[in-house]
């Protein structure tokens, strides 16, 4: 096992559709994009009636797991974004891109655990595994951004790249490479890399020094990752190459940025101490282009914890988080 990020999905009740469902049925425009030889699904969320109105691009990099972007069951559809995009769509065209070789739309009855897509062998598709890599996502997304900014309905005056969880690492590296990016939103990330969240989560499970050496097991796992850092074998979970690449500390991308950066995180998330470290280090270095927004007492997806340290799903904070993003962007 390696670090498990719980995917939070909320159901929106919709009118029953016919047998053939398209992104338009769910309120999205779709663009089929070819990256190298790969067909890429791009979804655009725009304010109704403003589809052709010139606005900046808000490019959202989602977290891990090979999930279809649009998921539905007999009751309705699950939200594509973890937040309600309506407020952001007033000022932006919001874009999200599908995972490689994962269907765009799926009935949840056809999906595996955590709504993941599995093939006939019961595994994630091999073509997905071979592309589920940091640099693949970064390079692909930069090409998509270049393409979108050529469209008549996209303003190039501002380009916001945002990412949550795994997506924060992708977003931060995009911002470090592409001069087109004007603002970065870094949400729920670990500036010291994925492996540090894995170790932190396992350390929290330890109760004594003899029988619960979970952190030590993760450090042994990390040694295996480094030894086999080009391996794409996914029989035991994420390929070593994917874990290695996402464990390169994003702090080295972040601290070089001169554009406005917003860092959001829950203080009960495993990554919280490392975001605090980033903040301390930036203060020490006199960097003034960063804004930090900690959500006190909340976990990875901004849910508060109960007395027994379980997420309280009755209190949904994601819309507050996204509304603050909009407020921050208005000020920057």
Predicted feature locations:
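Catalytic active-site module of serine/aspartate enzymes centered on a nucleophile-bearing elbow/loop
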Residues: 298-302, 306-332
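N-terminal cap/lid segment of alpha/beta-hydrolase-fold proteins
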Residues: 20-53
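Short beta-strand/loop motif that positions the catalytic acidic residue
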Residues: 257, 263-265
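Alpha/beta-hydrolase active-site loop
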Residues: 112-152
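Conserved alpha/beta-hydrolase "acid-adjacent" motif
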Residues: 270-277
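Accessory cap/linker subdomain of secreted extracellular hydrolases
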Residues: 114-122, 127, 183-256
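Short, surface-exposed "cap/lid" segments of acyl-processing enzymes
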Residues: 49-91, 103-108
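Primarily recognizes the serine-hydrolase "nucleophile elbow" in alpha/beta-hydrolase
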Residues: 147-202
């Amino acid at each position: 096992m390696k670090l498990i990020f719980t995917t939070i999905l909320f159901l929106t009740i919709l009118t029953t559709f016919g047998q053939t469902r398209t992104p338009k049925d769910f309120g999205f425009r779709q663009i089929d994009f070819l990256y190298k030889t790969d067909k890429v699904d791009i979804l655009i969320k725009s304010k109704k009636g403003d589809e052709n109105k010139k606005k900046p691009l808000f490019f959202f990099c989602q977290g891990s797991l090979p999930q279809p972007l649009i998921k539905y069951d007999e009751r309705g559809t699950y939200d594509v974004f973890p937040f309600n995009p309506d407020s952001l769509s007033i000022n932006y065209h919001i874009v999200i891109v599908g995972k490689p070789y994962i269907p765009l739309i799926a009935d949840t009855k056809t999906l595996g655990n955590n709504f993941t897509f599995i093939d006939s062998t019961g595994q994630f598709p091999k073509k997905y595994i071979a592309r589920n890599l940091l640099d693949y996502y970064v390079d692909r997304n930069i090409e998509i951004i270049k393409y979108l900014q050529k469209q008549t309905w996209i303003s190039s005056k501002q380009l916001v790249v945002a990412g949550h969880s795994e997506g924060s690492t992708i977003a931060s590296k995009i911002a470090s490479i592409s001069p087109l990016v004007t603002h970065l939103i870094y949400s729920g990330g670990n500036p010291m890399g994925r492996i540090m969240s894995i170790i932190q989560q396992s350390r929290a499970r330890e109760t004594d020094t003899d029988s619960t050496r979970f952190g030590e097991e993760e450090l042994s796992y990390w040694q295996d990752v480094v030894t086999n850092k080009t391996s794409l074998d996914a029989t035991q979970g994420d390929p070593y190459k994917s874990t290695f690449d996402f464990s390169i500390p994003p702090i080295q991308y972040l601290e070089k940025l001169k554009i406005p950066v917003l860092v959001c995180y829950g203080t009960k998330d495993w990554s919280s101490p490392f975001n605090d470290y980033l903040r301390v280090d930036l203060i020490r270095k006199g960097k003034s282009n960063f804004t930090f927004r900690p959500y006190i007492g909340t976990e990875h997806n901004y849910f508060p914890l109960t007395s027994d340290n379980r997420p309280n799903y009755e209190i949904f904070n994601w819309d507050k988080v996204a509304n603050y993003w909009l407020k921050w962007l208005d000020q920057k």
